[in-house]
Design a protein with these regions (language model features):
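A hydrophobic C-terminal alpha-helical subdomain
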Residues: 223-289
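Conserved SAM-binding strand-loop segment of SAM-dependent methyltransferases
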Residues: 45-48
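Oxidoreductase cofactor-interface core, primarily capturing Rossmann-like NAD(P)-dependent enzymes
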Residues: 2-42, 52-64, 73-82, 86-95, ...
């Protein structure tokens, strides 16, 4: 049995589907069981709980031998993951795959990336069979620009000349499924990226082609993005963290391209052009999801 935390998120929903296709028994650990059942289908067992509550997590891990660990971003991320690992150890879970960040490290600009680094250290010292997936920034994040693309034909962000090999969450899920179900990945840290490092202008050009109308990248000041995030209701720590992540991109620190998707999942990663084509209806309608 495989327990998937974050099962209704960008990666989790694709991961559960891929595991079901592989013939695995899958249990989804979620906050909203009704919504999860509708999204994930009848083949997935749904268990309600809170990853920050050891009692509900312990119940969900009964009979589980593999765990996909994705804690929600928060200032308590490292503490939550450490607690989950202890519950997993007591429950007899034998393999853990941790969802981490491409910029994870003790000196990262992003506080969440620093917390992921701390979580990686705890996992590595746990004695459990583990693999760490440092996923690049998602192509799906561009759906956040849906309204500005639909209304003004613009992507506004302070990316400067930075590049990133954005990854489709479908590809990260495919890698996670392979690592959870196949041997040979113990102790590995995989940086999971798309096939090309793109600038804001590159992304805009591919979106223009998919939408058959002009989309341009506008390099704005961080203060503009900060104000927008505040208006959208993001807590202050999240605003600061998102700006730190964008600054990491702008500084050229997440532009590496790896072959992990092809090597581990056994197929080429999706290009941004392919993502743009299937995202085009949402972007044209100004809908973020």
């Amino acid at each position: 049995m495989i327990l998937v935390t974050g099962a209704t998120g960008k990666t989790g929903r694709h991961l559960t589907g891929e595991l079901v296709r592989r013939g695995e028994r899958v249990r989804a650990f979620v906050r909203n069981p009704a919504a999860a059942a509708a999204a994930l289908g009848p083949e997935v067992e749904i268990v309600a709980g809170d990853i920050d509550r050891a009692d509900t997590l312990a119940a969900a891990m009964s009979g589980v031998d593999r765990l996909y660990l994705l804690a929600p971003p928060s200032p308590g991320l490292a503490r939550v993951e450490a607690g989950a690992l202890e519950v997993a150890r007591r429950a007899g879970v034998r393999r853990i795959v941790k969802h981490s960040a491409i910029d994870a490290g003790p000196a990262a600009r992003s506080s969440i990336a620093r917390l992921h680094a701390a979580g990686e250290q705890v996992l590595a010292a746990s004695g459990l069979d583990y693999t760490i997936l440092r996923g690049s920034m998602f192509m799906q994040n561009f759906l956040l620009f849906a309204e500005s693309i639909a209304v003004a034909g613009e992507i506004r962000a302070p990316m400067r000349n930075g590049r990133c090999a954005f990854v489709d969450c479908v590809d990260l899920a495919a890698v996670a499924a392979a690592v959870l179900t196949e041997d040979g990945h113990h102790g590995r840290t995989y940086v999971v990226t798309g096939p090309e490092a793109l600038s804001g202008e590159d992304a805009a050009a591919r979106l223009s082609a998919a939408l058959a109308r002009p989309v341009r990248y506008v390099d704005c000041m961080p203060e503009e993005t900060r104000a927008l995030l505040r208006v959208q209701g993001s807590p202050e720590w999240m605003v600061a963290d998102m700006l730190a992540s964008i600054e990491t991109l702008a500084a050229g620190e997440v532009d590496q391209v790896t072959d992990v998707v092809e090597r581990v999942a056994g197929r080429p990663p999706r290009t941004f052009a392919v993502f743009a084509r299937y995202a085009a209806p949402l972007l044209a309608a100004g809908a973020p999801s």
